[in-house]
Regions:
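Alpha-helical transmembrane helix bundles of large polytopic membrane transport and channel proteins
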Residues: 42, 52-208
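Conserved C-terminal guanine-recognition region of P-loop GTPase G domains, centered on the G4
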Residues: 2-72
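Structural and coupling elements of P-loop NTPases
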Residues: 211-213
């Protein structure tokens, strides 16, 4: 919630997303939420020396392409990767595709019923310029499907909020009927499914060496 508030109120040009690479599958979840928010970001895969010492392997370039954001192995305690991290930040800020070819905006597919609900809500949300200027309408629709109280309060005063909530509830009911899960769980499962698939495609494997902590 704090991160979301800062991103909305400060509207940074580029976000540096620091990821603890000791447990990528768990720690990439925030990255999927930043993708929903449609922010420009560069990811620091921090503590990368410890993953190497454990014998973990991953194609960082391929992972960057799949997430649509440059990912830079870093070790902040030694300064490793910091210069490259800031070079990527500048490249993303200046839209230099030749220097940061992996940067592109992607959508994570949450399943057809949820995606239909997102599209239907977006048709209404896009009518409000004050919302579009501060938020990704896709992000707002996803948060409504997660029954986020802050976003519900944001939407409630809108002229056609009843229609927006109706689309949300219809999509949630269809998800429940189809999968047996509530829409919040279905969204979380879809995100972790995306992360797992991306790591697999990037050749991620864990080593068999003992932890270095």
């Amino acid at each position: 919630l704090y991160v979301r508030k800062q991103l909305v109120e400060k509207t940074p040009d580029v976000v540096i997303n620091v990821i603890d690479s000791s447990n990528l599958e768990r720690n990439l979840y925030l990255t999927t939420q930043l993708i929903d928010m449609h922010v420009r970001m560069v990811c620091a895969l921090n503590m990368f020396d410890e993953t190497e010492q454990r014998g973990d392997n991953i194609d960082v370039r391929r992972l960057s392409e799949l997430f649509g954001a440059p990912m830079v192995p870093t070790v902040f305690t030694s300064g490793r990767g910091v210069k490259e991290l800031f070079r990527q930040v500048i490249a993303v800020y200046e839209d230099k595709e030749d220097e940061s070819p992996s940067f592109r905006h992607i959508h994570i597919n949450h399943g057809h019923e949820i995606e239909n609900g997102i599209r239907e809500m977006q048709e209404h949300l896009k009518k409000y310029p004050e919302l579009r200027q501060r938020y990704s309408t896709r992000y707002l629709a996803i948060k409504l499907l997660e029954h986020d109280k802050d976003v519900e309060q944001l939407i409630a005063p809108l002229g056609d909020s009843a229609e927006i909530f109706r689309h949300r509830d219809t999509a949630a009911a269809r998800v429940k009927e189809e999968t047996g899960s509530d829409s919040e769980t279905a969204i979380m499962d879809a995100k972790y499914g995306f992360i797992h698939g991306a790591l697999e495609e990037a050749g991620f494997s864990t080593g068999d060496k003992k932890d270095t902590y």
